[in-house]
From Swiss-Prot, chain A:
Broad class of where this protein is predominantly found: mitochondrion
Molecular function terms from GO: metal ion binding; pyruvate dehydrogenase (acetyl-transferring) activity
Residues bound to pyruvate: 83, 109-110, 156, 158, 187-189, 216, 218
Cofactor: thiamine diphosphate; Mg(2+)
Gene3D superfamilies, A to Z: 3.40.50.970
GO cellular component: mitochondrial matrix; phagocytic vesicle; pyruvate dehydrogenase complex
Reactions that this protein is recorded to catalyse: N(6)-[(R)-lipoyl]-L-lysyl-[protein] + pyruvate + H(+) = N(6)-[(R)-S(8)-acetyldihydrolipoyl]-L-lysyl-[protein] + CO2
Protein name: Pyruvate dehydrogenase E1 component subunit alpha, mitochondrial
Transit peptide start and end: 1-26
Gene Ontology process terms (BP): pyruvate decarboxylation to acetyl-CoA
Main enzyme class: oxidoreductase
Residues bound to Mg(2+): 187, 216, 218
Organism (species): Dictyostelium discoideum
Curated annotation (Swiss-Prot), chain B:
Pfam families associated with the record: Transket_pyr (PF02779), Transketolase_C (PF02780)
Lineage, broadest ranks: Eukaryota, Amoebozoa, Evosea, Eumycetozoa, Dictyostelia
Keywords: Metal-binding, Mitochondrion, Oxidoreductase, Potassium, Transit peptide
Assembly and oligomerization: Heterotetramer of 2 alpha and 2 beta chains.
GO molecular function terms noted in the UniProt entry: 3-methyl-2-oxobutanoate dehydrogenase (2-methylpropanoyl-transferring) activity; metal ion binding
Binding site for K(+): 156, 158-159, 209
GO BP annotation list: branched-chain amino acid catabolic process; response to nutrient
Protein name: 2-oxoisovalerate dehydrogenase subunit beta, mitochondrial
PANTHER family named among the record's database cross-references: 2-OXOISOVALERATE DEHYDROGENASE SUBUNIT BETA, MITOCHONDRIAL, 2-OXOISOVALERATE DEHYDROGENASE SUBUNIT BETA-RELATED
Cofactors named for this entry: thiamine diphosphate
Sequence positions that bind thiamine diphosphate: 130
Transit pept. (range): 1-25
Chief location: mitochondrion
């Protein structure tokens, strides 16, 4: 059992306070966001059984997806570069619940869970990772090149997606769609120059873009403390409003997301959300994740701030479901991911000609070693 | 023209057991491929090193002898993702070996400024695929500093190291070979080593070179290439190719990780067809050793050039153009380029994409019967 494995100490989760009313509404308090140039959302929310179960299920799916990826990688079925999201689930789940599927998201290379939250099937995600024809990018990209409706990837170059987010947001403003764009980046990417170019353009033209800094404390193997002057990413936009949010509490993320989306839709221009979160795993599969931080540090976060255990505790405290019922949900999730990965493993590899497709709109001749052996569409 | 006074002879050949355990990545046999490395004489005792250890050893010597040498880049403090800088911070302190934020443009610009002040910056860009945010700084600032100030300022002591090339499953952003972009820029020197011994000597020469050098390291070989490397201080001059193997029928030109593939093709051509191939390791992409190539082509009349980067606009095109200018009447067959396809570097199709020993063998065969 996951809960046994994590050895969760319920007393350690003491900062969560919930109050159930007779109508089935549950009040939940969380750490108030730090604010910059704005008032920010309140420090409490009202939730209910359906939402709690939904968050529990979604975040369990996110985590299980990554656990299966980890297993497939260790079996050498997934190759190359692969970055897992384990620990950061509340950010994805909370933000997705704060916006609609017509809003837009662009992120960096830790992208598997965003695919799932945007509505892609686990099978197409696994198939992409396994380089299969049924993958979301026809198996051509792999881990960091995933795309689906209103989700613009999956971007491997650190920070490069942020100006794209501003461009996507400009189109929303120009076309008066009323939709917003979430441009995600990490604390490592926060030091890339192009992020500041994007801040300026977005602010200058009042673009509906929410810049989201997922601060998991480490840019690859370098601690934020050693890479970043000043430690507040939410104030770094200078003239851009910001919030610092407890990114391990899905409700804190949701409320901040709603506040930011309303801010943008009201025409106030961009806003920055710094998500105080943590990744349990290494930067990538080749990083054991404990050379630049201690095992104790990782375990401490797991035991005191885990986003899924957090929700489990609320559910149990309010007697919304029993441990057995939650275990059944986890079993269903496990089954879903297992079946999806089996299907993906059984799927065919892409046709060889796919090497030459999608280079340009029209298929063009691609020169091989000799002219006669070149690819001709 | 050797600057390292420890070297007597650079071109003498000695076959060493330099081999790869991942030789079958391009469809070839998985048995070790002997690659003839060069002999460095009088560089002191030797020690078994792989490519990253040889590079580490080179930087160690550079820092020990030049108190102004500094090493920095993303994660280099704890050894770097490929372990090239391991132990250097402990030895030389955190003020000379340090991590930078993830900001390639800033790293390059910072390094140029530091070099202009007379320091010896050895900057690392974690993957050659990440060098493009720094492209402006390298091409517009580093390459032109000396020229646009009429010689008043320069960043000649700058060296930028970066791992390049196919690695098995790197995909679009961890596999590219961008040497041609930089070779196209006057003011820069571009170096790519092919063995641990070569890597150490060329790196020391690059660090001490008084023009900015982009030093691309074949990441496929960091661990797989192992040989006995002299632990002393030696340099291999830039701009000089190495004739790895002499031959009379056809000239084969490559660099970096491709040298091992070419040796395999050359061995096949000799064993199966009795063709005598002359194999040249270009070592320096810019300025490249035109004379050694021309001399060889005038002797053989046939040429195959091979690199991983896409064919169109690749460095083989530059070499081909020069060969036809200088050796037109000596050519017996069209110059062949065996390169990557004109597509982004693929993930799943890497084995189809890479110019492996079989493609090179076919090309040698065709060129011979033309």
């Amino acid at each position: 059992m996951l809960s046994n494995f994590l050895k969760v100490n319920s007393k350690a989760l003491g900062h969560i306070r919930t109050f159930a009313s007779k109508s089935g509404e549950i009040k939940h308090n969380f750490k108030k966001a730090d604010t910059y140039l704005c008032d920010g959302p309140s420090d409490s929310t009202v939730t209910n059984k359906d939402e709690l179960i939904s968050f529990f299920t979604e975040m369990s799916r996110f985590r299980r997806l990554e656990t299966v990826c980890d297993g497939l990688y260790k079996k050498k079925l997934i190759r190359g570069f692969c970055h897992l999201y384990t620990g950061q689930e509340a950010v994805c789940a909370g933000l997705e619940s704060a916006i609609t599927k017509d809003d837009h998201i662009i992120t960096a290379y830790r992208d598997h869970t965003y695919m799932l939250s945007r509505g892609a099937t686990p099978e197409e995600i696994f198939a992409e990772l396994l380089m299969k024809e049924t993958g979301c990018s026809k198996g051509k990209g792999g881990s960091m090149h995933m795309f689906t409706k209103n989700f613009y990837g999956g971007n491997g170059i650190v920070g490069a997606q942020c100006p794209l987010g501003a461009g996507i947001a400009f189109a929303q403003k120009y076309n008066k769609t009323g939709n917003v764009c979430l441009a995600m980046y990490g604390d490592g990417a926060a030091n890339q120059g192009q992020l500041f170019e994007a801040f300026n353009m977005a602010s200058l033209w009042k673009l509906p873009v929410i810049f989201i800094c997922e601060n998991n404390k480490y840019g690859m193997g370098t601690s934020q403390k050693r890479s970043t002057a000043g430690h507040d990413f939410y104030t770094r936009g200078h003239y851009v409003a910001g919030l610092k949010v407890d990114g391990m509490d899905v409700f804190a993320v949701k409320e901040a997301g709603k506040y930011a989306a309303e801010w943008c839709r009201a025409g106030n221009g961009p806003i920055i959300l710094e998500m105080d979160t943590y990744r349990y795993v290494g930067h990538s599969m080749s990083d054991p994740g404990i050379t630049y931080r201690t095992r104790e540090e990782v375990n401490h976060v797991r035991q005191t701030r885990d986003p899924i255990e957090n929700i489990r505790q609320i559910i149990l405290d309010n007697k919304i479901a029993t441990e057995d019922q939650l275990a059944a949900i986890e079993e269903t999730v496990r089954d879903e991911m297992e079946k999806a990965s089996e299907k993906a493993i059984a799927a065919p590899l892409p046709q060889a000609r796919e090497l030459f497709t999608n280079v340009y709109l029209q298929e063009v001749p691609v020169r091989g070693v000799e002219f006669v052996n070149s690819f001709k569409p | 023209m050797l600057r390292g006074n420890n070297i007597k002879k650079v071109n003498s050949l000695l076959v060493r057991s330099f081999h790869s355990t991942v030789g079958n990545r391009s469809g070839g046999p998985s048995t070790p491929i002997n690659y003839p490395s060069l002999e460095i004489e009088n560089a002191g005792e030797k020690q078994k090193m792989n490519l990253f250890q040889a590079i580490n050893n080179g930087m160690d010597i550079a820092m020990q002898k030049d108190s102004k040498a500094v090493v920095f880049g993303e994660d280099v403090g704890f050894g770097g993702v490929f372990r090239c800088t391991v132990g250097l911070r402990d030895k030389y302190g955190a003020s000379r070996v340090f991590n930078t934020p993830l900001c390639e443009q800033g790293i390059a610009g910072f390094a140029i400024g530091l070099a202009a002040q007379g320091a010896t910056p050895i900057a690392e860009i974690q993957f050659a695929d990440y060098i493009f945010p720094a492209f402006d700084q390298i091409v517009n600032e580093a390459a032109k500093y000396r020229y646009r100030s009429g010689g008043q300022f320069d960043c000649g002591s700058l060296t930028i190291r970066s791992p390049y090339g196919a690695v098995g499953h790197g995909g679009h952003y961890h596999s590219q070979s961008p040497e041609s972009y930089f070779g196209h820029t006057p003011g820069l020197k571009v170096v790519i080593p092919s063995t641990p011994i070569e890597a150490k000597g060329l790196l020391l020469a690059s660090i001490r070179e008084k023009d900015p050098v982009i030093f691309f390291e074949p990441k496929l070989m960091y661990r797989s290439a192992v040989e006995e490397v002299p632990i002393g201080d030696y340099e291999i001059p830039l701009g000089k190719a190495r004739i790895v193997k002499e031959g009379k029928d056809i000239t084969i030109i490559g660099w970096g990780a491709q040298m091992r593939v070419l040796l395999q093709a050359v061995n096949m051509a000799e064993e199966k067809l009795g063709i005598s191939c002359e194999l040249i390791d270009l070592r320096t992409i810019q300025p490249w050793d035109v004379e050694t190539v021309v001399e060889s082509v005038k002797k053989t009349g046939r040429v195959v050039i091979s690199h991983e980067a896409p064919k169109t606009g690749g460095w083989a095109a530059e070499i081909s153009a020069t060969i036809q200018e200088r050796c037109f009447l000596h050519l017996e067959a069209p110059i062949q380029r065996v390169c990557g396809y004109d597509t982004p570097f693929p993930l799943i199709f890497e084995k189809f994409y890479v110019p492996d020993h079989l493609k090179n063998f076919e090309s040698i065969k065709k060129t011979m019967v033309y």
